[in-house]
A protein has these predicted regions:
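Active-site loop->helix "elbow" adjoining a glycine-rich segment at hydrolase catalytic centers
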Residues: 134, 189-193, 221-224
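Alpha/beta-hydrolase fold nucleophile elbow
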Residues: 208-220
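A conserved short beta-strand
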Residues: 237-250
Length: 396
């Protein structure tokens, strides 16, 4: 039986979605919440969507943000192998998760809404849950088949998944970018995308039967870090009312705008170093970077070491005034209920990824991830526990 179309009118125009085959769940996919961050809008805060006339087709997922696609596909295939699924189910999931073949684009600032059918006609507004995907701030998408589930909508929630800019497109800091910013800062474009998505939810979710005063943000891994970042960011205040952080990093994986932290370069220094490699000598680097295609930039980005791509959220004193750890210690975070926890033995998801590269991968883990994020006794303890590549099996 063919699925039936449904429509909704949001702040930027009319959109068309679909009911699922059961007729009980409505889906709107690829709904733009900000203008495409392309051309002159690359490395700028998200801009408002240009309204459209007619009805926009929102029955299909939009593109993923530019990312390290092949590595993410390998990760999810490893995850599927560990789920203990039957052969048929496993093959179908692996076929669905061909991330490398998924369309990627800078025009990625879209979200998806899933809700009980006719929720907009109910006498009460439904709770809203906004999912922020993980992926080390460099991979992932709200469009992943892994998140394409009716579970929350079947339980009476309006479920929203979002995209945000990743890697160098989402977190590149550079003095020339700071110079053109009214705030004098740069680097948190992906975080600003998340805030823009929450503003869209505030302004539009009632159309879908959701309660804009009952919004829960939740995410896992880098998505859990994003939850803590949003609790720290003043511009996100009032946009959500509960938070769930699943397995966020506690390693201090935030760059400071103009000073080093542990072994990380300052965010602007890292941005200048990247620009030097891509376009050469300093001076006028920003205009030359914006003239390059996304494919050209991605090629340069993918040549960086897997664990050494230092484009993370930036403690800039404005968008992110301090690290979440410091904000929580000083009781300066958003005053909303928070549920936080970690998945047991989560790192075993990555164990199989270590075998093909052996000692080389182990070396990169130490030099590119553990050592920059650790200091003093913690670093020495790691060196004692994993002194050589022959001890990779201890990570399993």
């Amino acid at each position: 039986m063919a699925s039936k179309s449904v429509t909704a009118t949001i702040s930027s125009g009319k959109i068309k979605g679909r009911l699922d085959s059961s007729g009980r769940i409505a889906n709107f996919r690829g709904v733009p919440f900000a203008a495409p961050p392309v051309g002159a809008l690359r490395w700028r805060p998200p801009a408002a969507v240009e309204p459209w006339s007619g009805t926009r087709d929102c029955t299909k997922f939009g593109p993923h943000a530019y990312q390290r696609a092949a590595g993410f596909e390998l990760f999810f295939n490893t995850l599927i192998e560990g789920l203990g699924l039957g052969a048929v189910r496993k093959r179908s999931l692996q076929a669905a998760l061909k991330i490398a073949k998924v369309k990627q684009s800078e025009d990625c600032l879209q979200l998806n809404v899933r809700m009980p059918a006719h929720a907009d006609r109910l006498s009460r507004k439904l709770p809203v849950m906004v999912w922020i995907h993980g992926g080390d701030h460099t991979d992932g998408s709200g469009m992943e088949p892994l998140y394409d589930s009716n579970v929350l909508a079947e339980r009476g929630a309006v479920f929203v998944t979002i995209n945000y800019r990743l890697g160098m497109f989402g977190f590149l800091a550079h003095p020339e970018l700071a110079a053109e910013s009214p705030d004098g800062v740069s680097g948190n474009y992906g975080l600003l995308d998340q805030i823009a998505a929450l503003e869209w939810v505030r302004d539009n979710i009632a159309v879908f039967g959701g309660d804009p005063d009952n919004v829960t943000i939740f995410g896992e891994s880098a998505g859990g870090e994003a939850v803590l970042n949003l609790m720290t960011a003043p511009r996100a205040r009032g946009l959500f009312h509960r938070a769930i952080a699943q397995s966020p990093s506690d390693s201090g994986r935030w760059l400071h705008l103009r000073r080093p932290a542990l072994d990380f370069s300052a965010a602007e220094d890292a941005g200048v170093e990247f620009a030097n490699e891509v376009v050469g000598s300093p001076g006028g680097q920003l205009s030359r970077l914006r003239e390059m295609s996304a494919e050209q930039l991605t090629t340069h980005y993918q040549q960086l070491p897997l664990l050494g791509r230092h484009f993370y959220p930036v403690v800039d004193g404005v968008i992110l005034p301090t690290t979440p750890m410091s904000a929580f210690s000083a009781q300066q975070q958003a005053s909303v209920p928070l549920m936080i926890g970690y998945n047991s033995d989560e790192a075993t998801l990555f164990a199989d990824l270590m075998h093909p590269a052996g000692g080389e991968f182990y070396r990169d883990v130490r030099q590119g991830s553990v050592e920059p994020m650790s200091a003093g006794e913690a670093r020495e303890a790691f060196a004692r526990s994993y002194p050589t590549a022959g001890h990779v099996d201890r990570l399993m």
